[in-house]
Amino acid sequence: MPRTRTPLAAIVLAAGKGTRMKSNKAKVLHEVAGRPLAYYPVKRALELGASPVVVVVGHQAEAVEAALSAALPEAPLRFAVQEQQLGTAHAVLAAKRALRGYRGPVLILSGDTPLLRAETLEAVVSARRRARAAVSLATMTLEAPRGYGRVVRDARGRPARIVEEKDATEAERAVREVNAGLYCVDAELLWKKLAKVGTANAQREFYLTDLVPMAAQAGGVAGVEVPVEEASGVNDRVELSRANRVMVGRLAEAFMRAGVTIEDPARFDCDEGVEIGADAVIEPNVRLRGRTRVGARTRVGAGAVITDGVLADGVTVNPYTVISEAQVAEGAILGPFSRLRPGADIGPEAHVGNFVEVKKSRLGKGAKANHLAYLGDAEIGAGANIGAGTITCNYDGERKNPTRIGEGAFIGSDSILVAPIEIGAGAYVAAGSTLTDPVPAGALALGRARQVTKEGWVAQRQAEKQMKGTATGPASARKGRPAARRAS
């Protein structure tokens, strides 16, 4: 990743409400690949070596600050508040105090551009340095530039000014080169020129673009054309969805080039920050969320959803398994249709089968719960076998209680283990038992009613029913009328 060799600060503009999102949440908090929109331009500036990075917040300022601080806890972030949203120049001025004493270039970028690459930022920064210009700015060429500020160049082909669409003439609106909202400018020049920006425009706002003609007079402006995909901002849900698809596609491509098989990248979904080891196989419609780590040679079946899960090497996750804040050791087999809730710890070569739910429990090496079970607050020893329908009754209405099952124990189908309870190593629990007391190692426990078998009961019952019907007779006979006869 490129890093600038000279001092560099950055300002990320993230104060707007984003009315076109039609949301109660600030626009920059909407997520792409599991991260807030503003996370990406901040992260790219950091990758370039910018320090500090000042984030200008406004609408829902506390929430934006909290989200970025949580996502980038070690980053040299500073926050500046734009109390009123009076335009982009006004927003940049809000960052002045946070950069007090800093001398050097300042990179200015928008908080709603998640697809920018660090290489693109480096191109804008280096263009100013190479051209010895006062300002460098990113531009892009659009087939339909509606809504964007047009870049007007001088006779020598250098950017001379940017005209917002509402202020543009017909000739200027025909220009297809537009402002991408990405600038690099010397800090001293920035504060000096912004003090002169006024509101003589259709929006009655302080435009950052007014800096361009001033810079053209002070040392020139260097223009850098950048890819449309990268510089296009996210303004509504449609654009958010497109940006998410592009970002996930980039992640998928990086995984595949690193040796991961993704069977259908178009039906793959993951968050930024997910890790996948070499020779892992990801089937269609898998979702990998949060800080999930998938080990080498692990196979994740179709429809699985994993959030903050840690899977070791060689794990098999069968289709439609749901994992959340759980860890799985090497060689374990999960699913299909199993669920690991927070605190589940599945040991090496253990099996958690279909419709088995595990919460805050550890299964030792080779332990098996293959069908229809609930295991909560349990410690299950190596090699233990949990039969279908087994339930650990861990909650007594006030607190959670533990269940301990020893190594090699065998729990019969449809058993109910009322916690707190301990089943010793090698013990057997008969099918259908409800247990409340400890079971010693090597013992057999039965906790069910004794079976009673009544031979001939069905025939006796049928005879009794027949006798009852004969004694009562048909309804017509009881009323003194002859019974109706059926034609033969």
Swiss-Prot record:
Reactions performed catalytically:
alpha-D-glucosamine 1-phosphate + acetyl-CoA = N-acetyl-alpha-D-glucosamine 1-phosphate + CoA + H(+); N-acetyl-alpha-D-glucosamine 1-phosphate + UTP + H(+) = UDP-N-acetyl-alpha-D-glucosamine + diphosphate
Where found, per UniProt? Cytoplasm
Any idea which positions bind Mg(2+)? D112, N235
Q: What spans are recorded as compositionally biased (Basic residues)?
A: 478-488
Which PROSITE patterns does this entry report, sorted A to Z?
Answer: HEXAPEP_TRANSFERASES
Keywords tagged on the record = Acyltransferase, Cell shape, Cell wall biogenesis/degradation, Cytoplasm, Magnesium, Metal-binding, Multifunctional enzyme, Nucleotidyltransferase, Peptidoglycan synthesis, Repeat, Transferase
Record-given protein name: Bifunctional protein GlmU
